[in-house]
Amino acid sequence: MKKRSLGLVLGCALLLLAGACGTGQDETAGAIGEGSSQGSESESEGSSQEKIFGEFETVTLTGEPVTQEIFGEAKLTMVNIWATYCGPCIQEMPELAELAREYEDRGVQIVGLLSDVSEPEYATAMEIVEETGADYMHILPSAELQMNLLSRISAVPTTVFLDQEGNMTGSAYAGARSKEDWSGILEEILGEVGA
């Protein structure tokens, strides 16, 4: 009986680890990233052309000021919302860094948005970024981002794509993906935005 119970507990734990990590927020909070299983795509109603970020002022992990104007710096911005406690988030970061370099010439930028909202995690986040080689921009969650976006995220990683005006293009993607999967998604969205 003990072995069976232990097996059930371990099996459940593995299932949880295999997918996206919960945010610790109300799991019914919103439409963005609602499908919390690995690799799921969330078709949120009205997601196309929605300004999910709104106006914001924040800083990067290294302290530089950032506003919503960063989206105008590229034809397409891939925003990967991640957390320091999320294994799948951290595992995909090296490949996201490779994609950032490979797609830079095509007008694509990748931005990481840390969903951890307390300062002690910022040092941990910096260590993770350095260890994984994820040298693309990572921004911290301002009050505006917490209210307008992070409150609607039910799992990390969640990835969204934004055009130059900051409008969401396509769907929100919950869960980590391989470099090849992200490359295919990028190609599809670049075709849609005419880049």
Task: Give the positions of each predicted feature.
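Bacterial N-terminal signal peptides that target proteins for export
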Residues: M1-L8
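A short beta-strand-turn-helix
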Residues: E55-T77
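Short, internal strand/loop/helix patches
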Residues: M126-L162, Y173
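Aromatic-flanked redox-active Cys/Sec active sites in thiol-based oxidoreductases
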Residues: N80-Y85, S115
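C-terminal motif of bacterial Sec signal peptides marking the signal peptidase cleavage site
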Residues: L16-A20
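Structural microenvironment flanking redox-active thiols in thiol-disulfide oxidoreductases
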Residues: I90-E131, A143-N148
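Bacterial signal peptide processing site
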Residues: G22-Q25
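Thiol-/selenol-based redox modules, centered on thioredoxin-like
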Residues: D163-A195
